[in-house]
Amino acid sequence: MRNIIFAVAVACVAAGCATKQVERTSVRFMHWSVSHFSDGTYSVASIPESEGKRMAAKYVKFLNSVDADIVGITEYNEDFTTNGSMKASTALFKGYEKSVGPAKGDVCNAIFYKSAKAAKIDEKDVFFENHFEDTYYKAVKLNISGVPVWFVQTHLDSNTYLSGHRRDREEQMKKLIEDFRNEPHVVIAGDFRVGVRIPGKPCFPAPEEYDVFEKAGFELANLFGTGTYPVDSPIQPLDNIILKGVGISEVRFLEADHLSDHLAISCKLSIYDGE
């Protein structure tokens, strides 16, 4: 028996399975598509100035309840109120550093992070070549306890029913994979718009669209196609957190007090030593 145990141990070392990743630190991350702070009414920037302080308090209460170190926001709007008198970055994200991408119609991606947990190394905005909407990804490279991690926030196309654009979303997913294929630590979050959409008809969920990421070696937070967009019936699994080289646990889907038409996704990310 002793020889058998020794033989198994040697085989395990030879295969590399004896190498154990050591957690250097962990951070709380949240992805949320805020629908331009529309108070769950599914319109753009519908909060009047008179309601600004009251509504900001509701958003802050929710954000504080999650207490994320890093927050990725899709469908962001710097104007929290309709007249722009209140700015979201100062009204909602006090204590966070910000990196906000360009606003292109309904598309605007932003990443907020606490300086006590992370420091920015680099950032970039990359627009997708194949698109109907002005879709892009915002990427910020953060130093977390000495480990560089790319955080990517994106919103993919939904108009793949249009002639000439049927493969746009597929190509956008491939672009994300290719651009971060050689990076050891990556967290990609966003509204991926998975599903078959035809105007005037119910959307057909298609969580299998995420398979391309798994085949490329990424992990999914929304592994079982949990619906995150309750406006649709059936509910669509639009939102996800997709990662590699980073551990994930404690995944939760949060209704966020109906402050958006999307659920938020929060999780614990484990940052490991080395590559």
Q: Language-model features: where?
A:
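Active-site beta-strand/loop signature of hydrolases that rely on acidic residues for catalysis
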Residues: 28-34, 59-83, 112, 140, ...
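Sec-dependent N-terminal signal peptides
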Residues: 4-13
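Structured beta-strand-rich core segments of catalytic domains in phosphoester-bond hydrolases
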Residues: 70-156, 255-256
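N-terminal, active-site-proximal structural segment of metallo-dependent hydrolase catalytic domains
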Residues: 3, 16-88, 106, 272-275
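Surface-exposed cleft-lining segments at the edges of enzyme active sites
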Residues: 43-48, 123-130, 155-167, 196
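Metal-dependent phosphoester-hydrolase catalytic domains
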Residues: 178-187, 194-275
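Structural motif corresponding to alpha-helix initiation and N-cap regions
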Residues: 53-57, 83, 134, 170, ...
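Alpha-helical scaffold elements lining the catalytic groove of polysaccharide deacetylases
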Residues: 50-51, 164-178
